């Protein structure tokens, strides 16, 4: 409950922050989220019982939910074209490397006192001070207006039909949400099931933490070169990374050696590391300048939905195939799912969801 409740609260508040960003001051929403984040971290240091700790972590989930879409949405407000794509890639990379560093730091702090890991939650205080400078800069709305609000297409009728999402190409955004949800779900088997696999095959249990860290470091790398990757792969920018994820999961499933498992984690991470910033960039392009943060919020919410549902989906599917309790079956199952996604991605590689973004926009 202590770990799942914040994630559960993040989803509705990501969506709420996205909706509020359309008509409210984005910086005020960001400041509020960062302040709640810091306050919850501060009071966690003094929590004496589990009930109070759960309540404080719920506040943390609310604050995180408000910060997540705004931190990326402000990039879309201030940059355009290929430079925006590059900045979104860097943002994705920073998120993943921070996750690795924060996990390592909290593990060390926990050896001193169980309260000390909550010190990490005070870091948004630094971000809060830095974001105060954003009040001095306003995005060039004239430049932003050069981005097509919603490309003229047969989906315009669908856009008009969804009254609560004006200014967003809903069919394209839904396609991106589905792609992101499935891609996130299939790779989460690494973080959720790898420790059980290594324990089952009497491999070093301590090495599983290293493998998972390697996985997140691999996710970080493509974001640093995302525009170069898109230009090189062109319309293969989605289905080739999906094939990499499939190859990584199969390496983990087929070869039970620590070095092959590590390689599998790295390969799968590289594949997902291309898809994540690419989906963010395409999501921005489905909306006009007023609704970019809302579009990002909708897409980002499915990431946390996948995190919440992954264990239940894995249990359901392994049960249907009569493999309940299997340590390695989830890897081959998800490899099959992502292979099917890659086939679809190749078939529709010229489409908006599976194709490469146009940097001329």
Predicted feature residues:
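Conserved MFS/SLC helix-loop-helix module at the cytosolic interface between two early adjacent transmembrane helices
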Residues: 11-50
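Helix-to-loop junctions at the C-terminal end of transmembrane segments
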Residues: 12-25, 221-234, 318
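Structural signature of the two symmetry-related core transmembrane helices
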Residues: 28-42, 236-251
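Helix-loop-helix hairpin linking two adjacent transmembrane segments in secondary transporters
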Residues: 81-82, 90-136
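A late C-terminal transmembrane helix in Major Facilitator Superfamily
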Residues: 284-323
């Amino acid at each position: 409950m202590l770990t799942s409740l914040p994630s559960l609260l993040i989803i509705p508040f990501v969506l709420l922050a996205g909706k509020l960003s359309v008509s409210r001051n984005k910086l005020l929403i960001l400041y509020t989220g960062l302040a709640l984040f810091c306050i919850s971290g501060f009071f966690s240091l003094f929590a004496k019982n589990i009930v109070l700790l759960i309540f404080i972590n719920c506040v943390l989930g609310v604050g995180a939910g408000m910060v997540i879409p705004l931190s990326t949405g402000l990039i879309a407000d201030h940059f355009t074209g290929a430079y925006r794509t590059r900045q979104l890639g860097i943002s994705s990379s920073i998120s993943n490397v921070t996750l690795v560093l924060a996990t390592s730091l909290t593990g060390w702090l926990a050896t001193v006192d169980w309260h000390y890991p909550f010190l990490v939650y005070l870091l948004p205080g630094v971000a809060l001070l830095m974001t105060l400078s954003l009040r001095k800069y306003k995005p060039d709305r004239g430049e932003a207006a050069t981005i097509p609000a919603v490309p003229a297409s047969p989906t315009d009728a669908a856009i008009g039909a969804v009254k609560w999402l004006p200014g967003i190409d809903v069919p394209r955004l839904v396609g991106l949400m589905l792609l992101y949800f499935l891609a996130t779900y299939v790779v989460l088997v690494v973080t959720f099931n790898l420790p059980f696999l290594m324990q089952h095959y009497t491999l070093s249990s301590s090495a599983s933490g290293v493998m998972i860290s390697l996985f997140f470091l691999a996710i970080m790398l493509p974001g640093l070169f995302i525009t170069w990757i898109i230009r090189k792969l062109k319309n293969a920018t989605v289905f080739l990374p999906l094939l990499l994820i499939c190859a990584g999961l199969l390496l983990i499933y087929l070869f039970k050696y620590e070095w092959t498992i590590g390689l599998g984690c790295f390969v799968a991470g590289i594949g997902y590391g291309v898809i994540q910033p690419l989906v963010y960039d395409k999501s921005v392009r489905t909306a006009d300048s007023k609704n970019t943060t809302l579009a990002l919020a909708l897409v980002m919410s499915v990431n946390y939905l996948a995190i919440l549902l992954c264990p239940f989906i894995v249990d359901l599917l392994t049960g249907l195939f009569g493999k309940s309790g299997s340590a390695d079956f989830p890897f081959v199952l998800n490899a099959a799912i992502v292979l099917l996604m890659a086939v679809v991605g190749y078939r529709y590689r010229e489409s908006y969801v599976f194709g490469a973004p146009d940097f001329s926009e």
